[in-house]
Amino acid sequence: MSKLYFYYSAMNAGKTTALLQSSYNYQERGMRTLLYTAAVVCQKNDIKYIRSRIGLTSSARIFNGKTNLFKQISIVNKEKKIHCILIDECHFLNRNQVIDLTKVVDILNIPVLCYGLRTDFQSKLFSGSLWLLAWADKLIELKTICYCGRQANRVLRIDNNGCVIRAGSQIMFGDNNQYVSVCRKHFHKKYN
């Protein structure tokens, strides 16, 4: 029986690497995978692939707020059987797209593995994360560590001087050095 999985963490936990490894495992067994990533991530570099920090890459389809994932996946699956759907940057999904993914699991019987952030730099849930936390069959937290050695489960946004940014757009792209994964204790110490 297929399930909807949500793999979440703070930044720099290896979510994309884990996604690409999962896809490879399916492909190694002769199974087809279909990968998606968020258009907002691709707009900066006009890319249509998923790339991990350690250099692994794979081509991917792009989703934006208007993408009907159930319809797209149904068409591709009808042409040739898909064995697994993998979504990178799933925190950018909207409510209807998470519903689409539940239909992929329940109607098409295809497992869906979603990888993304749980919260933003203000410790607020992203839309996709909110609905995946509500509707996923399995929730799996990927671990990374704070500079103190505790598990990091929050993200701070910092400026060029190393000062914490407390306000601004939820979505901002730039160097990964603008974000620091920290534990709850150090989030509150630095953020407040």
Swiss-Prot record:
Record's subcellular location: Cytoplasm
The record's listing under PANTHER family reads: THYMIDINE KINASE (PTHR11441), THYMIDINE KINASE, CYTOSOLIC (PTHR11441:SF0)
Residues that bind Zn(2+): C146, C148, C183, H186
Q: Does the keyword Endoplasmic reticulum apply?
A: no
Known EC number: 2.7.1.21
Please provide the record's keywords in A-Z order.
ATP-binding, Cytoplasm, DNA synthesis, Kinase, Metal-binding, Nucleotide-binding, Transferase, Zinc
Q: Name the residues that bind ATP.
A: S9, A10, M11, N12, A13, G14, K15, T16, D88, E89, C90, H91
Q: Which GO terms describe its biological process?
A: DNA biosynthetic process; thymidine metabolic process
Q: Which InterPro entries match?
A: P-loop_NTPase (IPR027417), Thymidine_kinase (IPR001267)
Query: Could you tell me which Pfam families the record lists for this protein?
Result: TK
Q: Which NCBIfam families does the UniProt record give?
A: PRK04296.1-5 (NF003300)
What's the name of the protein?
Thymidine kinase
For this chain, the family text in UniProt reads: Belongs to the thymidine kinase family.
Q: Where is the active site?
A: E89 (proton acceptor)
Q: Which GO terms describe its cellular component?
A: cytosol
> Which species is listed as the source?
Blochmanniella floridana
Reaction catalysed? thymidine + ATP = dTMP + ADP + H(+)
Task: Using the UniProt record, name the top-level EC class of this enzyme in a single word.
Answer: transferase
Q: Name one GO molecular function term.
A: zinc ion binding
Q: Spell out the subunit comment.
A: Homotetramer.
